[in-house]
Amino acid sequence: MPAPAPISSVQAEALRTRSLPPLEEVRHGVWSLSSTVGDRVEGHSFSYLVEGSDGSLALIDPGWAGPDAVPRLEAALRSVDHELSDLTLVVVTHLHLDHLGAADDVRRASGARVAMHALESAALDRRAADGAAADADVARWGAPRELTEALVASWGSGRALPAVTPDLLLADGDELPVAGRRLRAVHTPGHTAGHLCVVEPEQRLVFTGDHVLPTINPGIGLGGRTASNPLDDHLASLRAMVPLDRPGADALEVCPGHEYRFVGLAERAEALVAHRADRTLDAVTALDALRAEGAGAASPTVFEVAERMTGWRGGLRSMTGFVLASALAQTEWHLRSAGRADELATD
């Protein structure tokens, strides 16, 4: 299925030219602004300002932390006749640095409250324990020794996460405290356990963070350990998007965390579900081939299965660090979802 067409020509052009798009009005009282991810313009993230009927503002995803984060926000606010003191709420869709990073800086500068899902807050609190457990995952995957140090550094105990304590914990269905707005939190686990989308039904907008993007297939399980399978969570969250959308003029406009705004939430969610089904089949086919070739031999490792899969762009051996770790974790989750994880090596 082709990628959805962009609603914003400005954002589409910035994506094409690898430049940073300017502040843009999405609807009356709603603006998008962009920020670099570290020093990189490519892959920039979006924040969204939403104005309440009393003149207060909510900020959805403050973006990457850095010396220019608050001055950039302050300049954007001035351009729409607001100031930092108008900001009363910072909503975090998920715990990644390109979305959450500047939350503390913005809170200190404005006095705004920071809100996130309770599971994201819990993941931040237990990041040390999760990192140690992830080190054990790396060992179990069976990657070559020369790759394991980078895997631990990027996925396990060496991975950096911010220390942010929220003022307000959100749950599925909660209405955000923005005057005159019906902004509703929708819990969409998968990318991370406490990922949130925010729906504005009156203006037919949905802010999707990294849950649904127009061309990128979002990673899963990237927010700490969970008792459930992140893949199964992700699929359920994608399917939950479909009934939110409507055909024609009442369709939701998707305001994602990256790339560009678009219409076609239901179709894009269904395409992502289909993509995951293809990946599950790829993993099962690779496992079957390895077991057929090695009948009576030791069970294959996660790395061996992933290396045999055909869906990786450039092949598994082209990956290192975090990207490789994510691929290996996803391989295991696909096999777990298919009921085949017990056929993998466990040590």
Whereabouts are the PLM-identified features?
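Aromatic/hydrophobic pocket-lining residues that form the small-molecule binding cavity
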Residues: 73, 234, 238, 331
